[in-house]
């Protein structure tokens, strides 16, 4: 029932954003319904090729690629039961596979069905092939402890620090609708061949769905990610406030595992450094489900601010022409005021060597762009409301601070955004992917000096005027 309500609300939101005439056609021609069932396979030699019942090299969920980097990668997946696992990988075009096992305290770990293997020592900008292996211990099966090697061979490419031109895809606030929305979103934004993909938080639906974290994360979006690109291209998943609730919220970190145990990261490809932050949620007991959690939110935001200061000293920061910050919640014109004391002193740096160029966020379900030094929102005229009360009230309730020196872009509900990266400019587009015939909610160009150029006619929205006080 809850899922039906969610999808009904989603459809209603789309219809509300379009006129009745425009809403009649639809980009939706199908949806995906995930089922756990047996599948018949026609085979000339079934007796030889049927998989052994203890062969768990074909995952129940996954595999998925995480943590894009020049010299490492993370592969995650879920098996049908707890078992020992590993990854065999090789540089494409070579014969011999290297093997990495999942071990715990020096011994092979047979206790898990959710797995993450971190590969290290890779070459930049290089294509690798990989396959999964599995094994049961003698305490787990009376029949065999054979080591099974996967028949399926997947591939991925490490980050290339010298790559000049490429595209990345971003979405936000997908709220568990991927089985309906993700295919047309990718197609209608032209993102089939993006180098990597970002989810900017609120990936699951509802406030308490991380009570059943695996189900809502996997069926909500990751199964579809793996179906479309996730086995072969990196996905970066950030945590939103809806991903930060429920007694299984820690499973988010188990599924999207990092070798350093953090939920923030940065990596550079070509001219652009991508900086991914975890904005968590408002550090008050009524939001954070407990006094200790509220305290930890402050600790973790402070830790990220210190990490940003150190990142500014790194070669990747110094070599980048563009610095793109990504998070679920922005610092102003929305509910992110609690973030300002931690991040604004670090991010709002006017110097060429210290500046960021754009901060792209979600959460508000209301597209807008705020250019440096302005206190107004921009949106493509073709999609601007004649009565932009929501935008005006947002700026009135959550004022834009003085002296902001970078661009902030806030995505729509089920945002579909692309960044075309070149050596000399970033071209950022918010696509009206759910509209038959397409269109752009916004498009702009950002140059290394931080200047912004509109690429479509835009409407500028100023804050709602303050009401005069009665005498």
Residues covered by each model-derived region:
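Sec-dependent signal peptide recognition
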Residues: 3-8
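Histidine-centered catalytic micro-motifs
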Residues: 174, 325-330, 357-369
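Acidic, histidine-bearing metal-coordination/catalytic regions of metal-dependent phosphoesterases
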Residues: 21-170, 191-193, 319-320, 421-471
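Extended active-site neighborhood of metal-dependent phosphoesterases/phosphodiesterases
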Residues: 64, 129-155, 211-313, 342-355, ...
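Divalent metal-coordination and catalytic microenvironments
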Residues: 77, 128, 173, 197, ...
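Conserved, compact domain cores that house catalytic/ligand-binding motifs in diverse enzymes
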Residues: 164-238, 243-244
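Hydrophobic h-region of N-terminal signal peptides that target proteins for export
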Residues: 11-19
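Short acidic, glycine-rich surface-loop motifs adjacent to enzyme active sites
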Residues: 204-207, 312-334
């Amino acid at each position: 029932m809850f899922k039906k309500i969610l999808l009904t609300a989603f459809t209603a939101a789309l219809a509300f954003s379009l006129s009745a005439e425009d809403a009649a056609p639809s980009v939706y021609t199908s949806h995906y319904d995930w089922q756990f069932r047996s599948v018949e396979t026609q085979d000339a030699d079934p007796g030889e090729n049927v998989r052994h019942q203890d062969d768990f090299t074909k995952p129940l969920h996954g595999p998925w690629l995480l943590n894009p980097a020049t010299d490492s990668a993370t592969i995650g997946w879920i098996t049908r039961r707890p078992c020992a696992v590993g990854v065999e990988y090789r540089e494409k075009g070579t014969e011999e596979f290297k093997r990495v096992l999942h071990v715990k305290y020096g011994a092979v770990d047979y206790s898990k069905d959710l797995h993450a293997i971190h590969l290290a020592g890779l070459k930049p900008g290089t294509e690798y092939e990989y396959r999964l292996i599995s094994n049961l211990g003698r305490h787990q099966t009376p029949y065999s402890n054979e080591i099974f090697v996967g028949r399926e061979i997947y591939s991925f490419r490490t980050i290339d620090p010298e790559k000049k031109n490429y595209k990345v895809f971003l979405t936000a606030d997908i709220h568990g609708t991927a089985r309906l929305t993700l295919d047309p979103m990718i197609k209608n934004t032209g993102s089939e061949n993006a180098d990597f993909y970002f989810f900017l938080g609120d990936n699951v639906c509802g406030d308490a769905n991380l009570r059943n974290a695996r189900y809502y994360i996997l069926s909500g979006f990751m199964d579809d990610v793996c179906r479309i690109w996730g086995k072969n291209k990196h996905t970066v998943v950030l945590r939103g406030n809806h991903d930060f609730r429920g007694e299984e919220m820690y499973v988010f970190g188990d599924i999207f595992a990092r070798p350093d145990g953090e939920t923030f990261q940065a990596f550079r490809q070509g001219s652009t450094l991508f900086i991914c932050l975890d904005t968590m949620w408002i550090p008050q007991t009524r939001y954070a489900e407990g006094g200790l959690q509220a305290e930890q939110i402050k600790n973790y935001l402070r830790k990220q601010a210190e990490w940003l200061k150190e990142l500014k000293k790194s070669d990747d920061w110094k070599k980048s022409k563009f610095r793109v910050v990504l998070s679920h919640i922005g610092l102003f014109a929305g509910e992110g005021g609690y973030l300002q004391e931690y991040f604004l002193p670090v991010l709002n740096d006017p110097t060429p060597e210290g500046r960021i160029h754009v901060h792209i966020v979600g959460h508000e379900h209301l597209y807008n762009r705020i250019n440096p030094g302005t206190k107004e929102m921009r949106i493509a005229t073709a999609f601007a409301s004649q009565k932009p009360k929501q935008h005006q009230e947002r700026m009135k309730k959550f004022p834009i601070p003085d002296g902001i020196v970078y661009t902030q872009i806030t995505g729509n509900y089920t945002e579909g955004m692309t960044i075309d990266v070149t050596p000399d400019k970033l071209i950022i587009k918010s696509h009206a992917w759910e509209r038959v015939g397409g269109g752009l909610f916004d498009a702009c160009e950002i140059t290394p000096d931080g200047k912004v150029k509109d690429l479509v006619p835009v409407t500028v929205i100023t804050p709602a005027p303050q009401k005069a006080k009665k005498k």
